[in-house]
């Protein structure tokens, strides 16, 4: 609430209390979090706070902005979509982030999930195979003041070994099988959240402990297919998005 002091005749002053301007998108965002995320079982207060703060309408095309706070995926161009908010929150919560972690994201898309991760982790490295999306997301994140996320245009199948190991890995497209390089780049006690499958997909949480891995399926999902599984072919070094 803002306060305004107005001068009156005779040297007196009048103190008025004024409500701050209503931010309609903030209201919609808060309503989305309460109705579509918290009410469906997401409990981590840091995740809920990040979902309230990251403006989804700035990560979708202008024609889709009016639908930004509906709990559904939206097209972002190049045949790709931005995930529904509940799935973003659910996958993020599965990483158990405390703010000290280094996270790898495969599939930057518009950068929305990247921004949510950046609000919760120390550093986020994100790979997008489509150069045009990588460039747009990188510019968008910089414009919005997000300084702890780095986006590259590359094939995510090989991960980003230069910055491994990662405390968390989050994959936003579904391969038929879990890419071995991503398993190798997961830190001890690290967690990977990844949709796996073809027509029928399951969201899996992989946890590394010592030399072994545990795997559990947590949710049936439907993601776009993983593109660029280049196993057995030379893999170019990641190129920073511009």
Q: What are the residue ranges of the model-derived segments?
A:
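Class I SAM-dependent transferase core
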Residues: 18-104, 115-116, 120, 135, ...
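Conserved nucleotide-cofactor-binding alpha/beta core module
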Residues: 96-210
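Bacterial N-terminal signal peptides
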Residues: 5-15
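A broadly tuned, weak detector of single residues within folded domains
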Residues: 11, 44-45, 84, 175, ...
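A short, charged
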Residues: 236-242
